[in-house]
Amino acid sequence: MLLKVRKSKASGNVRIPGSKSHTIRALFFASLAEGKSEIQSPLISDDALSAVEVCRALGAKIEKEDDKYVVEGFGGNPEVPEDVINVGNSGTTLRFGIMTAALGDGCSVFTGDRQIRQRPLGPLLCAINNLGAEAFSTRNNGRAPVVVKGKLKGGRTEIDSVTSQYLSSILINSPLIPLDTEVIVTRLNEVPYVDMTLWWLDKLGIKYENHDYKTFYIKGGQRYRPLNVTIPGDFSSATFFAVQAAISGEEFVLDNLDMTDPQGDKMVFSILEDMGAKVKVEGKSVRIKGCELVGREIDMNAIPDALPAMAVAGCFAKGETKLLNVPQARIKETDRIHVMCEQLKKMGADITELEDGLVIRESRLKGCKLEGYGDHRVVMSLAIAGLNAEGETVIDTAEAVNVTFPDFVNFLSRCGADISTCE
């Protein structure tokens, strides 16, 4: 599917859909619990649906009722799946799911789409082995497909958490292991996502110790109680509208955003404000209006998902914008550092690729044919670039937006953007 975009203004009110990260965590916690849970206002997208199917395959009973999921959990004792588990494009689901499967007896096999089969799992597989279960890559390359055989027992492991999902997977599942677990963290990127996982553990009354994110102790033999939660809006999805407002001079009011939530991407609003945009928090809404932007040096380690959109913002900021300390952006759905540099250069951007980020200088962009590489955040970021570039921009693999934000095109169109899809 192609996404066609022409230079146009967009403004208005947008209700941001539920957080993908919270939705997937809620589904796993509810599945691991014993009893019935309700998840209100979840994100309905390809990634979230992948999590639903994985939890079902492991024994959870999940029904969609109006705007909520009702989950009957398996009490920390997952079933042996009837077939190979396919996580689609969801890296979070894969990394959480393989350790959940290791809580039970028997073998499970996990795979995913082409992008998933290229994303690393090695450190998490080693941790699973260190904690008493078995896990290995069928191609012996630390990537899916992987085979997992339970049961986890507990003990001590190190983890090189180049992606926070490795550590989060251990934190989510280890309370249900019979013995205590000690985790030595040799590297940790994306700390806010770990904070989100810890927020859930606190909410559910789990006993653990966090020693400055270097060492974690998790008491074994615990249980998750059923939960009744409402999923907050997704700051990662809000980022695209925030950047559109900031670079165009228009105004958006973005509803369903809770600034007290642990999501790291809420930092985007303070970054854009520091660059010159006008930002006002109004309860559970954020009002953002564009103004002349000035380039900044930004440490992106905590917010790697914002790199594609902030690369676009840098094209419209005076001077130079540096997006630094985010090497993990290279192991997302695509190598987002390389892909954004490559595609924005096609539009005329003055942009330089670094090992751990990008340097962008103010540029006049021109529409052209672009490759989205099937990466939802790349496609949506290039769409924002296209709305502010001369002429027409055509982006391929537009269907990728369904991974996290199926209504992205409709929302922008309703706000006045000249944007549409076609085969």
UniProtKB/Swiss-Prot annotation:
Binding annotation for 3-phosphoshikimate: K20, S21, R25, T163, S164, Q165, D305, Q328, K332
Record: residues binding phosphoenolpyruvate: K20, G91, R119, Q165, R336, R377
Active site: D305 (proton acceptor)
UniProt EC number: 2.5.1.19
Catalytic activity annotation: 3-phosphoshikimate + phosphoenolpyruvate = 5-O-(1-carboxyvinyl)-3-phosphoshikimate + phosphate
InterPro entries, A to Z: Enolpyruvate_Tfrase_dom, Enolpyruvate_Tfrase_sf, EPSP_synthase, EPSP_synthase_CS, RNA3'P_cycl/enolpyr_Trfase_a/b
Keyword Transferase: yes
GO biological process terms, semicolon-separated: amino acid biosynthetic process; aromatic amino acid family biosynthetic process; chorismate biosynthetic process
PANTHER family reported in the protein's UniProt record: AROM/DEHYDROQUINATE SYNTHASE, PENTAFUNCTIONAL AROM POLYPEPTIDE
Family note: Belongs to the EPSP synthase family.
Name this protein carries in UniProt: 3-phosphoshikimate 1-carboxyvinyltransferase
